[in-house]
Every structure is written in C-alpha cells, then in structure tokens.
C-alpha cells in the first residue's frame, strides 16, 4: 500500500469501564496513493474473536483469520497463488480471543524477539528493522492523537 498520509480515529471504553484505557478503537487510514484502510481493535466483543486481516482491491482480495489464509483470490493468477491457497501460506497458532487480553499468547512476539537477537549475533539485518518498526509506532501514535483531538492527523508526525 505504501506510506500512510493521514489518520482519523475514534476510541472508547465500550464495555470494560473498570480498565484504564479504551477497549474499542477504529481508525481510517489514508495512504499516499489514495487508498483507504480501516484498523479496528477491541477487547469488547462477544464472544471474543480472533485476529482478522482483510485486504481488498480492484484486482484481488486476501482474508487472513487466526493467522491462516482463508481467501486468496486475484483477477490475474500467478503460479504461486495455487501453492499459497493449498498450503494456506501461514502457520496456524491458537491466538486466544479478543475478549480477554490475557488469553493472547506471546509466541509470535517471542519468535520475533529471537529473530532479532539471532540477526544481531550473526551481523544480519532483521527482515523488519527498527526504521520500519518506527513507522508502525508513528501510525499508532497518530491514531491516539486523532482519537484524542478529533482531528485528522497527517504523517509524518512532527514533535
């Protein structure tokens, strides 16, 4: 999709009034190429749902649920597409539900940290380095600013 241009967001304490932070957040992300995206996160859902990523465009759609590819369809098929559909492309993990944040396991985070440590030991660059990670953090900060101010927040952020 490319770089993010701006973010508009809303957060609330929909269900868990006893916690110190929001339990529902929705953001609309505008990319520099004009595409729009939606990011939603919640621990206020019943009965508690697993992670879900949807990517849709004029030439195809991908749907990932619980870290497994459920749909992989493109207008123009490539040889690798059938292989991805057959193997589902991703290892499946039991990820717990969004209803109880304590059920969300740490396995994927642990693997990511181990990979970074191994790259440092071997003098390699991690697949996602600190510069790329900062971009994700910048988007998260923009989402919080947008939800707090009610304004559309443009990126890159200024101090």
Label each residue range with its predicted role.
Residues 2, 118-122, 148:
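Residues at helix-coil transition
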Residues 139-149:
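Short arginine-rich
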């Amino acid at each position: 999709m490319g770089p993010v241009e701006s973010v508009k967001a809303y957060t609330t304490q929909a269900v868990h009034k006893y916690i110190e932070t929001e339990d529902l957040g929705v953001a609309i992300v505008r990319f520099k190429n004009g595409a729009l995206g939606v990011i939603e996160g919640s621990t206020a859902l019943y009965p508690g749902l697993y992670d879900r990523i949807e990517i849709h465009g004029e030439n195809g759609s991908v749907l990932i649920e619980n870290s497994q590819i459920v749909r992989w369809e493109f207008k123009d098929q490539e040889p690798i597409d059938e292989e991805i559909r057959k193997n589902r492309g991703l290892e499946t993990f039991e990820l717990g539900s969004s209803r109880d944040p304590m059920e969300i396991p740490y396995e994927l985070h642990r693997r990511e940290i181990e990979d970074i440590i191994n790259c440092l030991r071997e003098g390699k660059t991690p697949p996602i380095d600190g510069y790329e990670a900062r971009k994700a953090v910048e988007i998260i900060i923009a989402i919080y600013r947008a939800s707090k101010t009610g304004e559309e927040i443009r990126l890159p952020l200024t101090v």
